[in-house]
């Protein structure tokens, strides 16, 4: 039956309101329901579903907006639901229907291919947005009409208006679910059969034309294939472009998200790290409270040495040579101090100051030459030989020109040091330095040294309170060197403190004070400040005292400062081309240039010494400062110690070839052979001695740091479990490190040609290594596993001893009390160690200790002679002052013109109270005690009892049994109360620790020492001894 109302047959499309609404209305569901129509009819899709939604819709078939058809409640709407459809204005008759339909269909295809934007609707005068097959997520959410996506902005007009992203996530999810349902639906047998039947008849044929139904295109027609191919290609290209852009955007977003996440992780880690530092500073356990010092040889350690070796001799026999050399040295020092305090002020006659007379001019010049030849490394560059000779010329000139106080001080210090140096020269094989027939005796030289020193002390007291210029600073630095080598470091430190104070007053610690000076004067002042700074750090470690100057108190001696000095003042004279000069941009490249010129080698060496001194300063502040164990936790302290150890290793590894031990002699010899120098032999000797002294100083720092670390670990066993460090590994590292460094120092000493002034330069570091190796041998002599290592160390000690005293004891006797004391301790320790070693190893040869006893006797007799001569000088000075008569009242029988006859005087002849008092007037009793040969007994009231330490209060840095790694392995024990096992002790020492009478025995042992204390530890500590007097 003909249907003129526009309805289609059930198997085709219908023009009814319900079908049209189901096909084209997507306001709610976001998609057309044409797929449902296809499923109902059973006809296959000619265009893939993903492409159908983007196909343009003919304007003639667009539905008009109407309230009834804007909201759809489902996809299965009945066919009788009304729908307003805009039909064409001209209605054709049924006979013309087919031809008109073909014409209209071609027109629609052209419209689809051109993507027309016309939104005119038949029957409506309004311009509406062109309807699209799917709405974006934003329009769907707001329930507004969506339009086509702009190709430039990739957004619909609504998203452009609201500045929002235009996405279709909701639609994509619906399509994905739809595909899954279709796949599941077609998997059934019935559907498969239906699908196969549909494929055989892809397009349902229409009924007779009179039925009023429009016939669809035949699937096999060329027009239909062209349409489908064009539409498919267009959509595929669009999809590929869109997918590519989405993938790129997705990758960018993923990268941004990952970057943000990593940034958050880094920030969180940084916050936790800062919190960890705060926690470590405040909450982590701190080491046991203890103020460590660099002391090595103490009364407790001396007692342990005797007990560990199992010496059968009594305490009196064991301490006899030690007590005697210490008593002699103490009397000698007291005599010298009384001369400085009482006789350094000249006498007044007729309102004229009468100073001690100096030697003749020729002799004075010869002494000054010897003094300059033996300066070597300690005060290199402080004063030139020309300056010394000019002072002598001015002093002895007949023009009557007088010297100023600073010049008097400088001249007397140089003559005093020259007389002391000449005494060592005339004893050895260094007589090649002599140019004339001046051959003074030892007595003459000692007299010159004595009077020049008294004159120098007179001017020192005049100038020590006022800054008078560089002459005074030169003299103070030279006087400091003399006291350190001849007397003790404590006395020298007092002179150094005055020198540093004057240097700071002159602003030598600031770069700005050098700007207006010429280069030579600036270098001279720079050298003086360098010596102040480096000597201060050395004394700080030796005395366990805080340094006077810190790095924050100056802007000198930095890398930048060295670079500026070299680049501005030195390189322009060495490099002609400006292009080559511009290539030097840092201190290392600048130093690589100046090292090839011998006139600048001193500046080159000073740079590396300055770097080492900075490390020494950090070692003191970390390990030996008063608050070291209060401010730092146990782990933080170990962290800093490891960094310091790495700094020492890096310093040595990064040395220039001219500073390395294996090559410095070859490099410097070639350098000085090629360049002309005023005295190339002396310059070469000075440069070599500075390099050697630098290495001894570095090895000493490593020994001190390593021993302190092992002592710290032993003292804090309770903190092993909570530590994040590998304690056993650290213990083994530092225990072997101080041992190897000590052996290297002695082996290095064996390669030094004998020169007394050179030996004096390294005597403190050498004695440190010597005592460390002695203690190690005693500590491990009973360990069979270390038998070979102990034998090796004993051989090193014997070779070093032979090198020290020389063949046939030619270098044995020396007019230096510190040197003689070292020889006595070395001989005494080596005798007992060799005796014990031969006894343990069942040697067939009998050990003969007689050579060592004879050496000790020779040294003690020579030291006694030096002390007696010093006392005689004091008596002669008293006679010259006229003060001797006041002391002879009531004692004429005891005093004679040739001195005091006190050979038969013993300590029992004196009063019970301590007679030696530096801060009182001289008396006959004091002179008798100073001249007597008896040891000084233990006077109980000399030192306050509160300052006396028991056997358990050992301040020695050497750790007992520090080599046993089992000491640190209780970290693995489950019992938190575990302590050091007593099984670690040797049989001899088990009784040593368990005997209840040890304390009394130690007190009796210590009472045999002069004044009840050990005043020698690689250097004398006289000042503290007399400071404790009450």
Curated annotation (Swiss-Prot):
What organism does the UniProt record list as the source?
Saccharomyces cerevisiae (strain ATCC 204508 / S288c) (Baker's yeast)
Additional remarks:
Present with 238 molecules/cell in log phase SD medium.
For the region Disordered, what residue ranges are annotated? 185-208
Record keyword Metal-binding present: yes
Q: Which residues carry this modification: Phosphoserine?
A: 221, 937
List the coiled-coil residues.
Answer: none
SMART domains assigned: Fungal_trans, GAL4
For this protein, the DNA-binding region equals: 136-166
Cellular location(s): Cytoplasm; Nucleus
What GO molecular-function term can you cite, just one?
zinc ion binding
Q: Which GO terms describe its biological process?
A: DNA-templated transcription; positive regulation of transcription by RNA polymerase II; response to salt stress
Keywords for the protein's UniProt record, in alphabetical order? Cytoplasm, DNA-binding, Metal-binding, Nucleus, Phosphoprotein, Transcription, Transcription regulation, Zinc
Compositional bias (Low complexity): 196-208
GO CC terms? mitochondrion; nucleus
Pfam families named in the record: Fungal_trans, Zn_clus
What function does the entry list?
Putative transcription factor involved in halotolerance.
Nucleotide-binding as UniProt keyword = no
> Where does the UniProt annotation place the signal sequence?
none
Q: What is this protein called?
A: Halotolerance protein 9
Primary localization: cytoplasm
